[in-house]
C-alpha cells in the first residue's frame, strides 16, 4: 500500500529562486496557508543564513505550539555544529542536515574523502539528535553518487539517529525508470529508514521522477508552490498533488485550496504564473477548439482529466475563429439572449472572418448579435453577485481581531490579511445588489474598520 506525504519547501528552496525574497510577515502567512492546505511538513528555512529567516521560523514555531499551524516544522542546516545549534534553539520539530555525497561534491566542494564524509555525517546527525529533535539527512547530489556508497551513507545516517534520508537529484538529471529503480533498491538495501525525493526540474522531469520515486517506496515528496527554487526550481506542489490524486487516489493536500496558495505565493514572490501552467494557470480549464468545446459541453471528461471544481476552479471556453455552433449557442444561452439558427450562422461567419480578434468578450458578442438581429439585447443578470472588499483598518487596532469580526458577517465567504495599501481583503457573495450593499454596510460598521473599496468580480477562470 502506498504511503506518501508532501514536504513543502517554498520558504527554503523557493526563496532560493533568483530575485525572490520573503519578508518575515510573508513567511508566516505562507506557512499558515500551507498548514491549512494540509502539507505534512513545512521546510521553514535555514535559520543560520540571516536574521529575518531566523525570526520567521521563530514565529512559525510559535504558531505551531499554539495549534494554529499543524504541519511538522523543519529547519535546514549544513553539517556544521553551529548551524545545528541555531536550528535547535528555535525548537523546530526536525532538523534537516545536508551534505554533498557524490565524488564530485566531495572533491570540488568539501575537499574530503568518503571516510571523512561518513564521519562528518555521523557526528552531526548524532549531535542534532542529542538536542532532542528528529533528524533528516539530505544526500546532496545523491542521484550522481555511486550506489554502493549511497547505501553506506544512508545506513550511516540511520545508525546515527536519522529516521529519514532525502535523495537529492540536485541537477535534475534522473529519469523515471532510473528513479524507480534507485528508490526500490534503497528501500530494499536500507531497512528501518524512510526516503524522501528532492527532485530538481532542469530537464522538466521533476514531477515524473517524483511519481516514480513513490512507486519505488519514497514516502515524502519535496515540492514548492509554483515550482519555485534554484535555477528552474523543483517539483511544483499543485502538479504533484493533482498527479498523486489522479494516479494513486491519494489526496495529499486539500486540492480546492491550491489556487489560493498559488496566488498568494505568486504575489509575494513576484514571479508571475504563466497562463498555461497546469492546475492553477488561467488556461488550465479553458477550452478553445470547436470540437473540444462540443465534447466538453456534452461530457467534460472528454477533454478534462479531473473536474475543475476539484481544484476550486471553473471551466470556460474562448470564442474566436476556432469556435463552433455548440460553444456559441451555449454562450448566448448563458447570457440569456435568444438567437435563431439563421442568426447564429451569420454571427459565426462574422467571427470566423475576423482573424485579428483573439478573444470575443461577452460585450463583443452582444454587439455582434445586435448587429445581426437589429434588436437591442439585454443580457440576463447574474444569478449571484461576487465582490472583493478591500478594508483599511484603524492604526491603533490589531488587524487579526478585525479579521475575526469580519469573518462572521453573513455573506462573507473568505477573509485574508494582506500587504499593501489595504490591510484585509474580504470575499463576499450576495443574491442581488441590495444584499451586497447590506454586507458592505456591515463591514463598514465593524469596529476597527476605517474605509473600504469594493471591486465586483466580473469573470472567474
UniProtKB/Swiss-Prot annotation:
Its EC number is 2.3.3.14. GO terms for biological process: L-leucine biosynthetic process; lysine biosynthetic process via aminoadipic acid. Pfam families: AsnC_trans_reg, HCS_D2, HMGL-like. Its cofactor is Mg(2+); Mn(2+). Residues 4-259 form the Pyruvate carboxyltransferase domain. 2-oxoglutarate binds at residues 12, 76, 136, 170. GO terms for molecular function: 2-isopropylmalate synthase activity; homocitrate synthase activity; metal ion binding. Keywords: Amino-acid biosynthesis, Lysine biosynthesis, Magnesium, Manganese, Metal-binding, Transferase. It catalyses: acetyl-CoA + 2-oxoglutarate + H2O = (2R)-homocitrate + CoA + H(+). Pathway: Amino-acid biosynthesis; L-lysine biosynthesis via AAA pathway; L-alpha-aminoadipate from 2-oxoglutarate: step 1/5. The active site is at 292 (proton acceptor). It comes from the Archaea. CDD domains: DRE_TIM_IPMS (cd07940). Mg(2+) binds at residues 13, 198, 200. PANTHER family: HOMOCITRATE SYNTHASE, HOMOCITRATE SYNTHASE-RELATED. Catalyzes the aldol-type condensation of 2-oxoglutarate with acetyl-CoA to yield homocitrate. Carries out the first step of the alpha-aminoadipate (AAA) lysine biosynthesis pathway. Belongs to the alpha-IPM synthase/homocitrate synthase family. Homocitrate synthase LYS20/LYS21 subfamily. This is Homocitrate synthase. It comes from Saccharolobus islandicus (strain M.14.25 / Kamchatka #1) (Sulfolobus islandicus).
Amino acid at each position: 500500500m502506498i504511503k506518501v506525504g508532501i514536504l513543502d519547501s517554498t520558504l527554503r528552496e523557493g526563496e532560493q529562486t533568483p530575485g525572490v525574497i520573503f519578508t518575515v510577515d510573508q513567511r508566516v502567512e505562507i506557512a499558515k496557508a500551507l498548514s491549512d492546505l494540509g502539507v505534512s511538513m513545512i521546510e521553514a528555512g535555514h535559520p543560520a543564513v540571516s536574521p529575518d529567516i531566523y525570526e520567521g521560523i521563530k514565529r512559525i514555531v510559535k504558531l505551531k505550539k499554539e495549534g494554529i499551524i499543524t504541519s511538522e516544522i523543519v529547519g535546514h542546516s549544513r553539517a556544521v555544529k553551529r548551524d545545528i545549534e541555531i536550528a535547535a534553539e528555535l525548537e523546530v520539530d526536525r532538523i534537516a542536515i545536508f551534505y554533498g555525497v557524490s565524488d564530485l561534491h566531495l572533491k570540488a566542494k568539501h575537499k574530503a574523502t568518503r571516510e571523512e564524509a561518513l564521519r562528518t555525517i555521523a557526528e552531526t546527525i548524532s549531535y542534532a539528535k542529542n538536542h532532542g529533535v528528529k533528524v533528516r539527512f539530505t544526500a546532496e547530489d545523491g542521484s550522481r553518487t555511486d550506489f554502493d556508497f549511497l547505501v553506506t551513507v544512508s545506513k550511516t545516517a540511520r545508525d546515527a539517529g536519522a529516521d529519514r534520508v532525502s535523495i537529492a537529484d540536485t541537477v535534475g538529471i534522473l529519469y523515471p525508470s532510473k528513479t524507480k529503480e534507485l528508490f526500490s533498491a534503497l528501500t530494499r538495501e536500507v531497512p528501518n529508514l524512510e526516503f524522501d525525493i528532492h527532485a530538481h526540474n532542469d530537464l522538466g522531469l521533476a514531477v515524473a521522477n517524483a511519481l516514480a520515486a513513490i512507486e519505488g517506496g519514497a514516502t515524502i515528496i519535496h515540492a514548492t508552490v509554483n515550482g519555485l527554487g534554484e535555477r528552474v526550481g523543483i517539483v511544483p506542489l499543485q502538479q504533484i498533488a493533482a498527479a498523486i490524486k489522479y494516479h494513486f487516489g491519494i489526496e495529499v493536500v486539500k486540492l480546492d485550496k491550491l489556487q489560493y496558495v498559488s496566488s498568494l505565493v505568486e504575489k509575494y514572490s513576484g514571479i508571475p504564473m504563466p497562463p498555461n501552467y497546469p492546475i492553477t494557470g488561467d488556461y488550465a480549464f479553458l477550452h478553445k477548439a470547436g470540437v473540444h468545446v462540443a465534447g466538453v459541453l456534452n461530457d467534460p471528461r472528454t477533454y478534462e482529466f479531473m473536474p475543475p471544481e476539484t481544484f476550486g476552479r471553473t471551466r470556460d471556453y474562448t470564442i474566436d475563429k476556432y469556435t463552433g455552433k455548440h460553444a456559441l449557442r451555449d454562450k448566448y444561452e448563458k447570457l440569456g439572449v435568444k438567437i435563431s439558427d439563421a442568426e447564429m450562422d451569420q454571427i459565426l461567419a462574422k467571427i470566423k472572418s475576423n482573424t485579428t480578434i483573439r478573444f470575443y468578450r461577452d460585450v463583443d458578442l452582444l454587439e455582434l448579435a445586435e448587429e445581426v438581429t437589429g434588436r437591442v439585447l439585454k443580457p440576463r443578470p447574474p444569478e449571484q453577485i461576487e465582490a472583493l472588499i478591500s478594508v483599511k483598518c484603524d492604526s491603533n487596532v490589531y488587524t487579526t481581531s478585525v479579521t475575526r469580526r469580519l469573518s462572521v458577517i453573513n455573506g462573507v465567504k473568505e477573509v485574508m490579511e494582506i500587504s499593501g495599501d489595504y490591510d484585509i481583503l474580504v470575499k463576499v457573495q450576495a443574491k442581488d445588489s441590495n444584499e451586497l450593499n447590506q454586507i458592505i454596510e456591515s463591514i463598514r460598521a465593524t469596529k476597527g474598520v476605517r474605509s473600504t473599496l469594493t471591486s465586483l468580480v466580473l469573470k472567474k477562470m
